Swiss-Prot record:
Residues spanning the membrane: 259-279, 291-311
Domain comment (free text): The central ion permeation pathway is formed by the first transmembrane domain from each of the five subunits. Mg(2+) binding strengthens interactions between subunits and leads to the formation of a symmetrical homopentamer surrounding a closed ion permeation pathway. Low Mg(2+) concentrations trigger both a conformation change within each subunit and a loosening of the interactions between subunits. This results in an open ion conduction pathway. In addition, this results in a less symmetrical shape of the whole complex.
SUPFAM superfamilies from the UniProt entry: CorA soluble domain-like (SSF143865), Magnesium transport protein CorA, transmembrane region (SSF144083)
Location relative to the cell: Cell inner membrane
Pfam families: CorA
Protein name (database record): Magnesium transport protein CorA
Protein task: Mediates influx of magnesium ions. Alternates between open and closed states. Activated by low cytoplasmic Mg(2+) levels. Inactive when cytoplasmic Mg(2+) levels are high.
UniProt KW Ribonucleoprotein keyword: no
UniProt source species: Haemophilus ducreyi (strain 35000HP / ATCC 700724)
Assembly behavior: Homopentamer. In the absence of Mg(2+), interactions between subunits are weakened, and dimers, trimers and tetramers can be observed in vitro.
Amino acid sequence: MIRAFALDNARLVSLDENSPDQLNDAVWIDLVDPSEDERSVLKLGLDQTLAEELELEDLEASARFFEDEDGLHLHSFFYCLDDDDYADIATVAFTIRDGRLFTLRERDLPAFRLYRMRARREKLIDSNAYELLLDLFETKIEQLAGVLETVYSSLEKFSHVILDGKQEAESLNQVLSDLTELEDISSKVRLCLMDTQRALSFLLRKTRLPNNQLEQARDIMRDIESLQPHHESLFHKVNFLMQAAMGFINIEQNRIMKFFSVVSVMFLPATLVTSIYGMNFEIMPELQWDYGYPTALCMMITAAITPYLYFKRRGWL
């Protein structure tokens, strides 16, 4: 799918048609999982070659940030959710050429939806491709900050549940699963922050940005630097709560094992009495007693009650 946007009074307006003439007027061309026909339209109309899927997934810096005859290229990670609502990251390829911004991605992303909504109302300052690129990065950082706030709120809730110490092992297992998911979210946010920092560093080194965009890029870098310590504290808190949950689960399991161990020891004397009188020897005087059976029962009960009272007194039960 191709979305093309032109400028009208310093605001982005969507172009209804994707003909070569219309695309020539566009300042931003946004492509979501384009077909071969759509790639051909760009190649024939604007002489623009798009990155392939394998190129999008390349992690080498030289393959993610470079400049060639097709323009300036940046490949950046964006946070999103997969089809099962689990944290995921998607790669977006940015290309700036002839004053036009091209964005290529395989799925729709929240940061892009939010920016399109804002762009309908807010005017651009310099109305150039670099401003669009930095606005998208700015929106991404705002989204990541919102994700970190959500993680913080969830951690506060889980910390009360865990440190209360009254939850059963089954409930703590669910909390542990949720904490693992939060750790995954946190790690993906960290990856996006670091990747954006690398992209901006490349942009500042390799291009002569206009003054307003230069200051905007530096502001975004400062925002990233301010989020990183906050992210680190959340990451440490996730690990602390996971260890605390594991500790309480181990305590609960040890309590159960302790109970069964004490019970098994408590019945050992009674089992000994039963074993003695269960032997099949011919000469066992007690077997001839009239009260041998009730006497053996009393001995077994006494042998069971005595350890129980002792363990109870010691606080082991």
